[in-house]
Amino acid sequence: RAQLLAFRDGNRVDPLMNATMKGLSDQELESLAQHFSSLVPKVSSIVDKPNQAGMNIRARCISCHGMQGKTVNDQWPNISGQKKGYLQKQLKAFRDGSRHSEVMAVIVKDFTDQQIEDVSEYYSQQSH
């Protein structure tokens, strides 16, 4: 719900999502959030041996997102099984400041593109 609200109110920028959410009521946003929260996501590809470099990098992620990308608090998203490309895009946006989160900016500020790729691959391979 928080992310849909951020798109609607212009606090998170994505031209398609901003246009889609514009004009929706709080109740409509809540209904959308409940619908999407109830869906079972498909995992990109579960592997027997996950990306080792990504596994090492996840140490910076587990306090909020859990060992395998399953959040420990409803304030933070589950990232297990999320698409690798999406995770990469979001981590780079936090790193370069085009997506705002003080916590995430501090965590990823020194990540290289390779580290972002590795940790994104690791979490994309985790089951829900």
Label each region the model flagged:
Residues 11-12, 44, 99:
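Alpha-helix exit/C-cap motif
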Residues 25-28, 50, 112-115:
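Acidic/polar helix N-cap motif
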Residues 28, 57-60, 68, 83, ...:
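Short pre-active-site segment immediately N-terminal to redox-active cysteine/selenocysteine motifs
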Residues 32, 36, 59-68, 119:
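The canonical Cys-X-X-Cys-His
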Residues 28, 34-58, 72-75, 88, ...:
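Electrostatic cytochrome c docking/interface patches
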Residues 86, 107-108, 113-127:
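C-terminal functional regions that serve as terminal interaction/effector modules
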